[in-house]
Each structure stands twice: as structure tokens, then as C-alpha cells.
Amino acid sequence: MSCADTHNIDTIYLGGGTPSQLTTGQLRQIFDAIYIYNNVSPDAEVTIEVNPDDVSVEFAAMIQQLPVNRVSMGAQTFDDARLRWLRRRHTAQQVSEAIGRLRAAGIGNISVDLMYGFPDETLDHWERDINAALDLNVEHLSAYCLSIEEGTPLHRMNMKGADEETERQMYYTLIDRLEAAGFEHYEISNFARPLFRSRHNSSYWDGTPYIGIGAAAHSFDGHTRSWNVSDIRSYIKAIESGTQCAESETIEGDTAYNDLLTTALRTREGLDLSRLTPSHRDYCLKVAQRFIDDGLLSVTPRLVLTREGLFVSDMIIAELMKA
């Protein structure tokens, strides 16, 4: 797919699977196709997702041969027992070793994903994980509360995460510790050192057009959202035969309002009310008033989640959406 006639590509994100399992040749083929058929900005942010145990000395050397300048690593936790419970292959030691190898390969922008809210996890346990992440001197950190979804193995095992009050304390401890360490809390779950926000993720929250390549990948051109077929065999067959492999919908009316709300309100800058139609702006402010009165939202003049509103953001956004 090419966007050479329309826009420069400002960010590339290779993920949504396990790209660190690919060979040097396979990765080079992907990047060659992107760079040959598209206008890629000279300062593009180019991210690859990796598993810590995949970052061997050889993999780090391979990174040096590619245009990658940012790595996102799923550490999840630095507690080996919890990693085994999550059925992750790596250990806490492998996370540290992987980051060391990436630094030696010249990667100066590393993001780590963490998870909190495990069964029986205490605030002390969580603080140890935060401290371990800070000791690695990464530029970016994302943290998500463990969610045990219906139908998953953990749900079938009748496992439960931490209680809501413990999750709340963990979340605000995370914010306080990272901000004290110089990180900017720029989105509900994302923290960055100065100048190291994820440009790719920020483009989603800003409503910037993007192209998704691969099975189940989504794309957005500013007006229409499309999504590829999720079955990998059907996707490959469609690509090989040159047939349509995606469905689409036009983003307008209430759908456009809901999309803007659910992305912009997650950010530190909040929702620019001037981007709403007059009727949607009136509706939004009317519903938001009780949250403003409760100190969960503020108008600055953008609509912004307060510190107290961050933890209950999902509930607030759901209430503000139009059915």
C-alpha cells in the first residue's frame, strides 16, 4: 500500500504480533517495501515491538542494519513468579540484558510496558516494579491494569485481580513516582521523558490518518475507517489474488463525536471543544457538568480529566458518548 501521492510517513510501527521473531531478511523486505513505495520523513519515528527473550546479541546487531530508532518491549513485571503466572517466556534478568544490548546497538529510545493489579499484589510489590523500570533509564513507559476478560483461561480459572481501591492506589503511586522522576504523564496510561512521547500513538489520539497493513489491521484516512479481514489465511489469499480484504465505514455524526471523545479525552491536553459541532458541544457540556461539579473534569477551555478523574476515565467517557 502506498501513500506517496498524499502524505509523508512520519511514523512506522511494526507490532501487533511478534516482529522480533522475523529474520533480518524478512524485516529488511518489509522496510524496503515501505521506503521504496512511500515518502518517509527523514526524521520518522520507526518502532519495533520485541519480546525481551528475543533480543539476543545477534538480534541487536540486526537492528543496526534497519531504520529502527525506537523499541517497545513488553516487560510486564520484574517478578519472575508473576511472569510465569502470565506464561511469559522471559525473566526479569532478560529484560535488563535486552535493554543493555539495544543500547549497545545505538537505540536511544526504548519504551517498556508494565502491568499492575495482579492477584495478591501489594502496593510494595508494585513500587518495586516501578523502581526496577526506573533503574533501567528507559525513555518511555506504559502501564496497564490487569484485566481478566470473560472466556480467557484466567477467567475460567476463577482468578481475580486486585480490588478497586488497591488498583487506585497503584495507579496514583505510578503517576507520583514517574512524575517525580521527570516523566511527563501525557496520556492515561503513558509516560515519557521530555521529547520522548510516542509520536505514533499520539497520532491516533490526534486523529491523524494512518495505514494498517496485515490481518485485522485498521486504517483511517481522515473520513473513513477500514479494517482488514482477521483470518490470516483469508488475508493472504486476498492479497495474492488482488481482491478486496477490508470492510469500511464513514466516520461522521455521532460516530465522529464518539471517536474524538474517546481519543482526545485520554490525553493531557484533553478535548478541544471547538472541534465539535454545536449540537455535540452542547450535549457534551451538559452531560459533563456533573463530573465538573464533582471535580473529575475541568474546562480550561478544553475539556480535561482532572487528577481525580483519571482513574475513572472509562466511566466518564462512556457517560459522555452518544449511543
What spans do the regions from the language model cover?
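A short, conserved structural fragment
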Residues: I292-R302
